[in-house]
Amino acid sequence: MTTFMTSRMGRLRLPSLCFVTDRKVCGDKPLEDVVSQAIDGGANVIQLREKDLPAADLFALGVRMREITKNRSLLLINDRLDIVQACGADGAQLPESGLPTSVARWVLGRHALLGRSVPSVEAAKQAEVDGADMVIVGPVFETSSKPKATPVGTALIKEIAESVPLPVIAIGGITPENAGEVIRAGAAGVAVISAICGADDPRAAAEALTQAMGEAWRDRLMERAKAGA
């Protein structure tokens, strides 16, 4: 694996596997258990995204997630900067409709990791200017979490990856079968919900995703080396 260094946060291992939580998709499986198993399987970023929870419950869950992820993976909180600060998370994932990246950077400081969901090359370039550390692009494929959304495909992944010097994280319908495709298109990682939450064995699911990404990542590096020879 390769390590990517930003100017503001610590070290982000690439290719990155981000597990986005959804306790409803997890069903009877305790979310804490699923998160821990996902980390054991290779998830190095956990994004807490439980938008229906009131602040007190989200904070309590965030504290538990921080305990599980400490010294094991990065922890991001979706949208809620107050919860990021309250539970000591590593940063925030900002949705397209969320606060401006520059405001989040001002609130959380220069050491926080900030991801930004972007729909276009122009938005990705603006996210970089405003202080984002990575951009999230999708849905790449059809996904049950956003059934009405039109998939953007791997072409947009490639275009954004070639336009900004930030890691591009692909989301939406990612599985072990297509994870390599998005990595070869230029993504620096993937973010998944149901591929792990809905799996009978979350650890095995994470391992399969990690393996698929790793193989495609090595292929990319070899192609780059040959091109530069």
Feature locations, PLM:
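Conserved N-terminal beta1-alpha1 strand-loop-helix module at the mouth
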Residues: 1-101, 106-134, 149-152, 159, ...
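Flexible, gly/ser-rich surface segments that form the specificity/activation loops bordering the active-site cleft
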Residues: 138
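Juxtamembrane interface at the ends
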Residues: 144-147
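Short, glycine/charged-rich "phosphate-handling" switch motifs in NTP-dependent
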Residues: 188
